[in-house]
Amino acid sequence: REVALNLYKGKCGLHHNEDRWAYISDLCGKVPSWKEDYLSILTHAQYKCMPAHGFFVLDAVFEALKKAKVSKEFLENHNVSLIVSNDSECYESADLVKHVKSDADNRQLPVTTLFNTLNSAISMNLASILHIHGLSLTVSAACAGGGHAIGLAKMLLDSKQTEMVIVIGAQECASRYCMEAFDALGVFSPDNVQPFGKGRNGLAPSGGAACIILEPSDSLRLKEEKVPSFASLSGYGFSSNGKAITTPDSYQEEVSMLKAIENAGLDEGMIDVVLAHATGTPMGDEAEAKAIESIFPICPNVVATKGMTGHECWMAGVSQAVQATIMFTYGRLFHAATTEENAFPKLNLVMRPKWYSPHHILCNAFGFGGTNSSFIISKV
């Protein structure tokens, strides 16, 4: 609810972080601390094996499980799968190097070090904590990872290989270490992120965690527990650019969106909202705007929230699914509060708060390496 209220108010969650003193830009998301005291909840080994942003993940997962009325007994006795989008553990890796240099002896490292420095640290730790018996997997696909994690979950459920999938997006918070190399590309905004704006000059990284729980609409558990379905995952599409590692390709982004629409059994005219990737970079936003304009002769509402949330990178796709569900729940669209002027007149960018009850929201998450993901969240 707090997230919904802040987004509807157009409240910007970015700040200048003094810890990032060597960066070209110190603008990043302001992420509060995790809610629970996990020292009293987890075993000592579980606590030590978890990377720092894993505690944000635990907050998100436990809240999602509670809302979906998923019990500990259900997790232990059913074929539940876990898919995590995560692509770095920089803080823990930097800490590892610091200790080895200081001690000149890797035998002094705690045995837990290995398990919080792997990209798969979140999924392997959660699989143990939650007693997962289905697939446990980490997807590393840069900023498209969250969308691909959702798509893979859909494939698992459609093929009836699992009863439920817990999908998580996890992103190290914008601390001293985790975004140094990204910042070196010169794509971070020094002052204000303007998705699709004429004055856009870059993105601002953010982090934390998001979680959604997917299960078939005919699930017996949903009926027995009287669990309301918030929304339906109706389609997934993907593509790859096959070009330079940092260069967006509007045609392949178009392919990704069209695949998702086809997979959902819809036509273009039935999409009434596009929740755009739109990070605020000059090239990236232009490519996505061109792709959207090419697909839709009459442009649907385009929502771009990263001027408020920052770009949550590895968790972005999953947080978009949460945002789409919020818009269904409240019947109101988020607006590009920080964008001063729309650079693309044909793009129906939502610039002011708008009451609107959507039926199908197309979400985009694109990443380095030219990996593109699109998925559709539909009203139930």
Where are these regions (language model features)?
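Condensing-enzyme catalytic core mediating Claisen C-C bond formation in acyl metabolism
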Residues: 1-18, 26-27, 188-266, 272-273
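ACP-dependent fatty acid/polyketide chain-elongation machinery
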Residues: 1-46, 68, 220-234, 322-336, ...
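Conserved small-residue
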Residues: 7, 61, 82, 126, ...
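Conserved beta-ketoacyl condensing-enzyme motif
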Residues: 9-137, 170-178, 268-286
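Active-site pocket-shaping loop/turn-to-helix segments
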Residues: 42-62, 109-118, 136-150, 197-210, ...
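Structural signature of cysteine-dependent C-C bond-forming condensing enzymes
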Residues: 67-85, 96-111, 128-136, 158-165, ...
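Acidic, glycine-rich active-site loops and adjacent beta-strand->loop/helix elements
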Residues: 86-88, 142-145, 169-174, 235-240, ...
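Internal metal/ion-chelating core segments
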Residues: 140-214
